A protein has these predicted regions:
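Stable alpha-helical elements in mature extracytoplasmic
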Residues: 326-333, 480, 484, 488, ...
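Auxiliary tRNA-acceptor-end handling modules of aminoacyl-tRNA synthetases
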Residues: 31-322, 340, 344, 349, ...
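The catalytic-center signature of Zn2+-dependent metalloproteases
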Residues: 354-374, 482-538
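Bacterial N-terminal signal peptides
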Residues: 12-24
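Bacterial N-terminal signal peptides that target proteins for export
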Residues: 1-14
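Sec-exported extracytoplasmic/periplasmic mature domains
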Residues: 335-346, 494, 498, 534, ...
Length: 902
């Protein structure tokens, strides 16, 4: 059908000569150390104006493009004043173009950041089609296919249509038959839909214009200065006047590759991003999905050699914006992946080059993969890649580091919110999936940055207090560069196609992590694709490296699966060899769990962010001990006078306090995941040494976790800080653009501590966890011990409501209350949760409902007994608290007259 739309004499001899010459030209910067071999045609260059023709269409062509600057390239362009025209020969009609969109210059807010790619996992494939006297811009449907020429392919054509985005009038015809169109109706619009990130703004065509335009033999690069207008009522700190917000958008357009690349089938045991398609020519019993991993095309220069350089290496350019002091650490992190590629058969698969200070290419160019350093003030790092949506071949990748990534003292540590606490511990019920770089609708940026900054702040605080003389500049630099190398390795892994593996840090013991001989030879975590915390041990314990920046066995295995050359030449022909590689998944060091295994309610207690070691309880105890050691010294160390005699800032004390509190809370939350836990495995039946898909955490381990939480999370002792400390937790006193006002200048002690307690309590009493505890009783053989729902409720009540039965005889005063204020807050929260479960507040678990109602009845009986004791003279606050609790419980019991009984 497309052929019928094309003119029979599409190309003149002159055009054929031009195309041959263009195709013979080298790819810009393909394999050479020089920045760019293919010289772009530029509107600012010395290209000659287009010539006019004698025929009528050619005369129109000559008039239209008189004095225009021609930019020969993949798509010939003509720039004239504020107009930009494209000349589409018939040979380009029906071809598939890959369109990459990115932000060349942003506003430093709302994800509109310079260097940011647009449309993660939703890359555009366009066609230009001639319909009558117009050219249509069509976005292709690429997810559904069938074998060409088969009956199923006809059915697919009937079932799924492409999307016609634009229809542009043909303005003129060139002497060679090319169709000239104005590109403004296509690109001088809100094509990337950025207005969605700017509520109250709309695209302002009258204030938008073309920026830099470049044309190469293999791609064209278009920049648009897109202005979005508003009434000015909205304030954006980084924009001088919100009545006009200008964002520089870059479009990189190239032909979708037609090369020797062989897609590789994905396997759920190995963590790659995938390109998922539906093949309707398959005869299958299950779904019709064909899943290819996302990876680069690597071919051996010498196919017979066991280890050979690639024909074309993966080249990353360190952008000239990267500070000199950090370039060696970044280079080390990127080049470290060559160890894995060598074991897959490639020598020097990845090359790192430094962008010169003066160069004529841009980082957004599809021909260049870059490590970019930006200053958006949002403190993040990310490593997205752009792939051929038909094959999974990675075509372009850029690692982006924000300069504030290394700013580990942050104002948000001054006061926490339930939302910020949830973000540090895997999200909450109903939160969107935290799938870094995963595909449409997935989180566009790797969320490593927030936790890494907190971990660095923890290390700086702990070392300042525990190390004699405080944290030296040398140790501080070591801490930062070790962490920077590890993060560079992590983000580079994403650009190679790898997903997160949150089981990486859970194999070895804490003792192994602190044995530098082991970590410097064999690494620490089994994968750098985990979120690895800083390794800081309590004073008096053996201390290893802060970060172990080495690839782990999982990383090497994953690269083998994705990149090892295999015989066959077709995806299905590789299946047998791929199965041999993936079949090793039962080896403990190759365990894999990713984002969707590590969210709120997920069962595996060994799949965590920022955990360290094989024992979550040991790690939680170590963190609790560290916090207890460091907390008393933070005022002296964080606000002490510096060597110049200048006074310290109290907000640093408050920030350090917040970091320590969150360190304690996060570790306890991870330990709480043992309760109702199931250790998961992605291994397939028949894999060597493979565990079953689920293994119930032993009752003894679950009880150990509950005992730990009773003391370290629900007890008052961990939060019994000195009054002097509380009175020195001052907030930042600056108030101007770029700063946020805290809710309270003094520290909201009760609120923040209760937020962390509620986070753990919410986990333990979550309907999904309660359902698993009940289900697990059936998953454990009858002759083995199991933690029951009844025991869980009983243990929680004893931990949280201990004073009901354990208040000793005596007289209590307001300064020495029977129940302190922190415990009173926790008890109110617990009773509220029990009440909600008893009233069947969406649990769907009748056993939990009955047990919660039973606990409330027991509490009423205990409260009656305590309030009636003559030898226990309660102070007014504790008595009022207990009376109020009883009244609340009775309202629940009275309202639910038919509440079940255990």
């Amino acid at each position: 059908m497309l052929a019928s739309l094309c003119r029979p004499r599409a190309c003149s001899a002159a055009l054929i000569v031009f195309l041959v010459a263009a195709c013979a030209g080298p790819l810009a910067g393909a394999d050479d150390a020089s920045p760019a071999k293919a010289e772009p045609a530029s509107a600012a260059g010395d290209a000659k104006p287009a010539a006019a023709s004698a025929s009528a269409p050619q005369a129109a062509y000559g008039v239209l493009l008189k004095d225009a600057t021609k930019l020969p390239g993949l798509i010939p362009l003509h720039r004239k004043d504020d107009k930009l025209y494209a000349e589409l020969s018939d040979s380009l009609l029906g071809k598939e173009f890959f369109v990459l969109t990115s932000i060349a210059r942003g506003i430093g807010e709302r994800s509109l950041l310079g260097g940011m790619s647009i449309g993660f996992g939703d890359d555009w494939v366009w066609q230009f089609r001639k319909v009558d006297d117009t050219i249509q811009v069509v976005r292709r449907s690429v997810r559904f296919f069938a074998a060409q020429g088969s009956p199923e392919s006809k059915a697919v054509d009937l079932a799924y249509t492409d999307s016609v985005l634009f229809s542009v009038k043909i303005a003129a015809t060139s002497p060679s038959g090319g169709h000239v169109i104005d590109l403004a109706p296509i690109f001088l619009t809100d094509l990337p839909r950025l207005a969605a990130s700017l509520p109250g703004f709309s695209f302002a065509r009258d204030r938008s214009n073309w920026g830099r335009i470049k044309a190469f033999p293999d791609n064209v690069e278009l920049e648009v200065a897109a202005t979005y207008g508003s009434s000015g009522a909205t304030t954006i700190d980084t924009v001088p006047d919100t009545r006009g917000v200008t964002i520089i958008i870059r479009y990189s357009i190239s032909l979708l590759p037609q090369n020797s690349y062989v897609p590789r089938l994905a396997d759920d045991r190995v963590g790659y991003f995938v390109t998922a398609l539906k093949d309707f020519s398959q005869q299958v019993e299950e779904d019709r999905f064909v899943r290819y991993i996302n990876r680069w095309q690597l071919e051996k220069a010498d196919p017979k050699a066991a280890i050979s350089p690639p024909k074309k290496p993966i080249v990353f350019w360190i952008e000239k914006t990267v500070p000199f002091r950090y370039r060696p650490a970044i280079r080390k992190g990127i080049e470290s992946w060559n160890e894995a590629f060598e074991k897959a058969g490639f020598a020097n698969a990845i090359e790192v080059r430094q962008q010169p200070d003066v160069t004529d290419w841009d980082p957004e160019d599809v021909n260049y993969n870059t490590f970019r350093w930006i200053t958006s003030g949002q403190g993040f790092a990310m490593g997205p890649s752009r792939v051929n949506p038909r094959t999974g071949q990675i075509l372009d990748a850029d690692i982006i580091f924000d300069a504030d990534f290394l700013q580990f003292w942050r104002r948000e540590y001054e006061t926490f919110t339930p939302q910020s606490i949830a973000a540090l511990t895997g999200g909450g019920p109903g939160d969107p999936p935290l799938v870094g770089h995963g595909g449409p609708g997935c989180c566009p940026a790797c969320s490593l940055f927030a936790g890494h900054a907190r971990e660095t702040a923890l290390a700086a605080t702990a070392l300042a207090v525990n190390v004699p003389g405080g944290l030296s500049e040398e140790e501080k630099e070591k801490l930062v560069t070790q962490g920077l190398t590890l993060v560079a390795m992590h983000e580079l892994g994403h650009t190679l196609g790898l997903r997160h593996n949150f089981k990486g840090s859970a194999l070895k013991s804490l003792a192994d992590y602190n044995d530098v001989e082991k970590t410097r030879t064999s690494g620490g975590s089994t994968s750098v694709m985990d979120y690895i915390p800083v390794n800081i041990m309590p004073k008096g314990k053996t201390q290893g490296d802060y970060y172990s920046a080495r690839l782990g066995p999982y990383d090497i295995w994953a690269i083998e699966y994705g990149y090892k050359p295999l015989a066959g030449g077709k995806p299905e022909a590789e299946r047998k060899e791929l199965e041999k590689i993936a079949g090793r998944s039962g080896e403990p060091e190759l365990a894999y769990a990713t984002d969707e295994d590590t969210q709120w309610g997920d069962p595996d207690p060994h799949s965590n962010r920022f955990d360290l070691g094989s024992d979550p309880i040991e790690f939680a105890r170590a963190r609790a001990e560290l916090v207890a050691q460091v907390m008393p010294g933070i005022v002296e160390r964080m606000a002490g006078r510096d060597e110049d005699g200048d006074g310290g800032r109290y907000e640093r004390v408050r920030q350090a306090f917040g970091v320590l509190l969150s360190t304690h809370g996060s570790a306890m939350y991870n330990a709480s995941r043992l309760v109702g836990g199931l250790v998961g495995s992605r291994s397939h039946r028949g894999d060597a040494n493979a565990p079953p898909p689920f293994t119930v955490v032993t009752a003894a381990r679950q009880r150990e976790a509950l005992d730990l939480l009773a003391v370290e999370m629900f007890g008052s002792k961990p939060f019994s800080f000195s009054p002097e400390l509380y009175n020195q937790l001052a907030s930042s006193r600056w108030m101007h653009w770029g700063t946020d006002e805290v809710d309270r200048e003094d520290y909201p002690v009760h609120d923040v501590i209760l937020m962390w307690q509620n986070r753990v309590l919410s986990r333990l009493l979550d309907p999904l966890v309660l359902a698993r505890v009940r289900d697990n009783e059936l998953k454990v053989p009858a002759d083995q011990d199991s933690l029951s729902l009844a025991e869980l409720f009983e243990r929680l009540s004893k931990a949280v409501m201990a004073e009901v039965e354990g208040t000793a005889a005596g007289e209590y005063t307001p300064r020495k209350p029977a129940i302190d204020s922190l415990r009173r807050s926790l008890q109110r929260s617990y009773v509220t949760r029990l009440s909600a479960i008893a009233m069947a507040g969406g649990t769907g678990n009748s056993d939990a409902q009955a047990l919660a109602a039973g606990e409330l009845r027991k509490l009423v009986a205990g409260l009656d007994t305590l309030l009636a004791k003559e030898d226990v003279k309660l102070e007014p606050m504790s008595r009022a608290h207990l009376v109020e609790l009883r009244a609340r419980i009775m309202k629940v019991l009275d309202a639910g007259i038919d509440l079940p009984r255990p």
